[in-house]
């Protein structure tokens, strides 16, 4: 109990006022609320409406077992009454009210808040004095008010008034004002600079934002003026108008009825009446408007809600001009209770992955009270495009972001939301046309999910769609790919790159296409990250056709032929490795090439050419990682290609043939380009090509017309062997 500091002994005719000191924690709490939890002042109205809603919940709950509890007031509602003359905002509810003890305890000490806690206590046989606990939200009233008066009436006690100017103490007295019946009236005496909260527009804005889904009607009472047409005499003075009206009525009553046929006297009066001028005056009246007519759609049975209703709610929630693409409406009951209504928009926002921008996608409610709309813990980043509401029965109303991070309840809600989202996507996938629209907009999110969410990776992988070497213009799922696999095919083959045409024409897919093996085309940068985590699908390993050790289905005869080719070109491989030195890790005979002379592949755990390109484009890249991930390049040569065969013969005929070195380097650099890599020194490569062009055109390298810079570079280049231009070109060929 707070310490009672002073009791005034007054004559019996005057009401007794008791003064109490706030507990020390209250002063600290108020400072904490103002400086930490509630930086935006408008939150006070949400908290007070929420408290009213709690009080209404409690009386409604009690009336279930004892209907007579509502005899003191059948209607359950909340009224908001701004008064500009007195600079007060009053919040009135017909809830359970508070006894004197409740007032002293609940508005003088830190009290718990929440309907559920109260109901559990009541079921456990707790004393009735435990009710009406306002919680910390009440003190947020002092963000805008210099003084707060609370008048309350409980069924089991008299009407009392609590008052405090936040000066470390509060007073409690018996209230002799207008009887309330039952409920609580909170009167905020606003600070001079907070009068915006008396404006009709501002109050409506706050209620719509924070409390539009409270389960009881919230009515705003506003004093307004309207024009009323009266005669001049009436306009001059109200009393005269009344007297004149009475006199006219009396005169008309005194007239004999026989004169109703239209005497001269009546006509005169009519003319005089017509001559009287009419004038408009301002008349004051009280306008009542219910602010939360939209009842929470998520609390209704999904079977009773039409798609049009979902559409209207979605548009009001998101301000989107288009209808939603899909919707999931569900509730979870048991140890944990919450309802959720989730929408998939038709298109992704342009700033979907803009991390610095705060998201406003899923609104968190606690028992129909809006808590926050940027709750990162509620849904993983890869599902940040999902719009909707989550309404929990178990979270405390005064929860902060810091508390949310530790909340076990929220972790369970998050798990359920992800599960339901994946169910929704799977249902959507059954409609090919709609899923195509969805995938065009949100495929990156699915792939990001595969990279980040190991728990749901399998389900997410079923949602992937790709172009393949056999799919034409249709995108297919990995499941579709698996159904078309060859009998002896053990792996799922894929290639990453920039465009569909680029990967389709790549040297890496030549032999696979020739053998009728389907190759998946992964042409988005995020595919590289996705496939790093997606190692297998339905027991089949995903294999990149651009990496070393590619295993293709082959019979014994093919294996034997391949071994013979390896032996035949072993020497050339060694010579080429010596020439290229550290540029490549090794040179081997390829089993994947058909029409290309050579290609560059990467080690199993290194980056592909496409990944190297992506990483080089990163502004904040780690150069040390670039060093060891990008260096593992292997040169594969095609033993069936005429260039490689001729080069082998030339190298074996004369190991010291200088043109071999030039040709090997040229082959390597060209293979780098065709395999998707970039050149470290493009100018040197260009100069080699220019020399080939000169030879082709029969231009003498020593031609004095050649510019100095070209000549200087040419001197540095290893010369091509031969005495004349003809022999040189033959070597190149």
UniProtKB/Swiss-Prot annotation:
| Interaction with NR3C1: annotated span | 9-236, 272-617
Q: Where is this region: Interaction with FLCN and FNIP1?
A: 285-733
Where is the stretch described as Essential for interaction with SMYD3, TSC1 and STIP1/HOP?
A: 729-733
Record protein name field: Heat shock protein HSP 90-alpha
Subcellular location, record wording: Nucleus; Cytoplasm; Melanosome; Cell membrane
Alphabetized NCBIfam families for the sequence? PRK05218.1
Query: Cellular component terms, GO, for this chain's entry?
Result: cytoplasm; cytosol; melanosome; mitochondrion; myelin sheath; neuronal cell body; nucleus; perinuclear region of cytoplasm
Gene3D superfamilies named in the record? 3.30.230.80, 3.40.50.11260, Heat shock protein 90, C-terminal domain, Histidine kinase-like ATPase, C-terminal domain
Its PTM note reads:
ISGylated. S-nitrosylated; negatively regulates the ATPase activity and the activation of eNOS by HSP90AA1.
User: Keyword annotations for this protein?
Assistant: Acetylation, ATP-binding, Cell membrane, Chaperone, Cytoplasm, Hydrolase, Membrane, Mitochondrion, Nucleotide-binding, Nucleus, Phosphoprotein, S-nitrosylation, Stress response, Ubl conjugation
Family membership noted in the UniProt record? Belongs to the heat shock protein 90 family.
Native organism is Equus caballus
| Sequence segments annotated as region (Essential for interaction with SGTA and TTC1) | 730-733
Q: Which residues carry this modification: S-nitrosocysteine?
A: 599
Q: Which InterPro entries match?
A: HATPase_C_sf, Heat_shock_protein_90_CS, HSP90_C, Hsp90_fam, Hsp90_N, Ribosomal_Su5_D2-typ_SF
| Sites bearing Phosphoserine, chain numbering | 231, 252, 263, 454, 477, 642
Residues annotated with Phosphotyrosine modification: 314, 493
Task: List residues, modification Phosphothreonine.
Answer: 5, 7
List the Gene Ontology MF annotations in alphabetical order.
ATP binding; ATP hydrolysis activity; ATP-dependent protein folding chaperone; nitric-oxide synthase regulator activity; TPR domain binding; unfolded protein binding
